Amino acid sequence: MTRRRWLRRGLWLAAFGCLWINVCDDPPLRTDAYLLDVASDAAVVGLVTAAPSASQLTVRGADGAVVATAAEVEPVRRHQLRATGLQPGNSYRYEVVAGAERFAGVLRTPGSAPDAPVRFAALGDSGGQPWWVWLQRTPLWHWPARLGWLPDHGPVNAVGAELAAWKPDFVLHLGDVIYPKGQHAHYMSGFFRPFAAVLREAPVYAVLGNHDVMDAGGRQLLANLRTRESMAHDGGRNLSVVRGPVRIVIIDCNGSYGGRRYEAGHPTHAFLERELAAATEPWIVVASHFPMRSASRQRDRADLLLAMLPQLVEHGVGLYLSGHDHCYQRFGESGGDEPVMVVSGGGGKDLYEVRPDARAKALDPAFHWCAIEARDGRLQFEARAVGGRSIDAFEVKLPAGTALERIAAKNPARAQRIGQLR
């Protein structure tokens, strides 16, 4: 009798243990409708469905009249619906129907004037995962994870909520969108759910971080956050976003793309040189995942200081944004030859310590995001800790003096636009 009792207990224990073994597939990636890109006359709405389906996009103006439609006729899981014929500086409501599901959101087209106001948010290293994501392939946790019953990572949720409340025109993500290896299985819990509210109303343009490229070279990020049109140029790894008087140049400096050292001959070096030489916008912002200077774990990056910094100085770049270190750092003052260098890696992953550094103007190991706004001839920057505390604030000044003289000699169209804003 005792032997049977122990046998039953052993079988129950073995059965319970089987519930904790990774034998299931990861839950399929699925999202709400989200904005991939918005231009003055068009917008692209993305959607990932759990199973293949057709989809229909309807865009309505303020009076409720239909102004644009688009459709994916063939059943697919990954949808990109492009609405055209929109008007600059307008707000529209959109609806996506895919199978039995309906999604709705708001899109705002940017103004077409060269000095149109623009506001955008920037952050990096937000891809922290909740504890249960490592158990979502077990029989016990698979269906709760698949049905979205489990909570997401708290700091990432808090950042996402504050971004949505601020209502930016778009979000610039500085890389490491998803930890630990940028896999599709972790996008729902680490990105699409925490940022769902802001994604419904503003596109996210993301830099490829080192964790984003650890699996399949970053193809997951490119599939989730690039339009098909942007993939035609540099495979979507490098791109520019232009809004009014601001150009943001997004570049890939990962060692898996073009070699470990950033130098002349690197494909990103060539792309950046072309973009900087052709840009006519008064303010240029360059965004990479990797800091040039650091007062935290990553330290200075010599190849960027030697090969990229001279490019930025030569072309009068005002701001260099990066992530990688999980904290806030600022080096430099606006108005000098070098751009202001900001490290913003406090988007939700575990924070890093900072160390005293005489070169740094601001240091703070806090979860945060950055609010950037161009209006009335000024570009204002503020880093905001979660909860509302202001970490740092400054103005990105227009090129002047010898910097403006260099620009006028090589790019008179840009120099003229700078003069018009003064």
Give short role names for the model-derived ranges.
Residues 1-14:
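N-terminal Sec-pathway targeting helices
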Residues 29-42, 46-48, 55-56, 241, ...:
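Binuclear metal-dependent phosphoesterase catalytic core
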Residues 34, 70, 83, 91-114, ...:
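Extended active-site neighborhood of metal-dependent phosphoesterases/phosphodiesterases
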Residues 44, 54-56, 128-134, 214, ...:
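Short, solvent-exposed loop/turn elements at domain surfaces
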